[in-house]
Amino acid sequence: MDKLRIRGGRPLKGSIPISGAKNAALPLMAACLLTDGTLTLANLPHLADITTMANLLAQHGVDIRLNGHAQGGGGSQGRVVELTAATIASTTAPYDLVRKMRASVLVLGPLLARCGQAKVSLPGGCAIGPRPVDLHIKGLQAMGASIEIDGGYVIASAPAGGLRGAEIVFPQVSVGATENLMMAAALAKGETLLVNAAREPEITDLAHCLIAMGAEIEGAGTDRIRIRGRDRLSGAHHTIIPDRIETGTFAMAAAITGGEVELVGARLEHIKSVAKILSGAEIDFEETEAGLRVRRRNGVLLGVDVMTEPFPGFPTDLQAQMMALMCTCTGAAMITESIFENRFMHVPELARMGANITVHGASALVRGVPRLTGAPVMATDLRASVSLVIAGLAAAGETVVNRIYHLDRGYERIEEKLVACGADMERVRETD
């Protein structure tokens, strides 16, 4: 397996292009199943999870064509992909593909809405606690679907005449369930109302794409989304939003090294909660013509408390990076994880580097230390792995991050982007 070797202590200075948002791209790719026309997506990131979704869509008969890179005012806007599901060759999403990524379950709603049936393996992905698909299933059942779980598969069929609109109240906020049901409702009969819906920018991005395909959707970005079903949707062209998690990650990397970077393409409105909390830690965000400039205010990094929350709160996908940042703060920080269980697996690895962290249930108390020390560490999931990279950038000596295949699931060319800003690091490719 590949590893990253990092020699820390060098401030990051320069500009970093922000890639298209993985968490927007995956549901947008699944949306191609809703139409026999061509869905063209620009600013597609080059990631392992994107490849997994492409392989899954190909299994369903989708014709996939990559057309290089689109150019825009800010330079390269990522890859452009054309997805055409003229006919659905299979309504089964097999275990060998779905096990690699939990977002694969997003084909369930589109397949069921268009074909009247779907057989989707229960999903895999990062090992960070349970993420049951119950909310997806209950929502589709409210729309008239018959669903059973057998042999590790969700087996669903729509009623005669197709899915029907319904009022669906989520007992808890779920991004994936909101996306799945919004796509299914776009082809359902009548009106669907999603109450306590997720409000993430990725939800709004999906809604904008579906509207371009002919869907009728109101309220995306609020907790009440209204969808009026259409008989059919058409193809469309859509540009994927920049990745707010990558934006926050590189902002924290710049801050922990005492550097200054411009995040090209980043949007402040997507990370307001992050910018507000980091401002309390003495980190400045400045909007520029190209994106955002990030730097420490007075050279000191102050400890600040953080609780993860659904958008517009602080994202759980930045919790591990925030913990790494707080390891060298002045004072202490209490970090509370309210979204997922078992998401502190990076703590023992940060401790190997000299971090002072005590876990109490869903909270971790981080007491700042003057300096972290390089060490061999092991990545356990996507966001934990990048927190170790952030820590390594600031640590004295050499840090080796093992099992970085997790990183490739969510960060495009991360070592290239960091090296371009002065980081001393390289990928070591294992041949065995």
Curated annotation (Swiss-Prot):
It is found in: Cytoplasm. Transmembrane segments: none annotated. UDP-N-acetyl-alpha-D-glucosamine binds at residues 102, 131-135, 317, 339. Its main location: cytoplasm. The keyword Protease does not apply. It catalyses: phosphoenolpyruvate + UDP-N-acetyl-alpha-D-glucosamine = UDP-N-acetyl-3-O-(1-carboxyvinyl)-alpha-D-glucosamine + phosphate. Phosphoenolpyruvate binds at residues 22-23. The modification 2-(S-cysteinyl)pyruvic acid O-phosphothioketal is found at residue 126. GO terms for cellular component: cytoplasm. Gene3D superfamilies: Enolpyruvate transferase domain (3.65.10.10). One of its GO terms (biological process) is cell division. One of its GO terms (molecular function) is UDP-N-acetylglucosamine 1-carboxyvinyltransferase activity. It is an enzyme of class 2 (transferase). It holds the Pfam family EPSP_synthase. The active site is at residue 126. InterPro entries: Enolpyruvate_Tfrase_dom, Enolpyruvate_Tfrase_sf, MurA_subfamily, RNA3'P_cycl/enolpyr_Trfase_a/b, UDP_GlcNAc_COvinyl_MurA. Its EC number is 2.5.1.7. Pathway: Cell wall biogenesis; peptidoglycan biosynthesis. Keywords: Cell cycle, Cell division, Cell shape, Cell wall biogenesis/degradation, Cytoplasm, Peptidoglycan synthesis, Pyruvate, Transferase. Cell wall formation. Adds enolpyruvyl to UDP-N-acetylglucosamine. Belongs to the EPSP synthase family. MurA subfamily. This is UDP-N-acetylglucosamine 1-carboxyvinyltransferase.
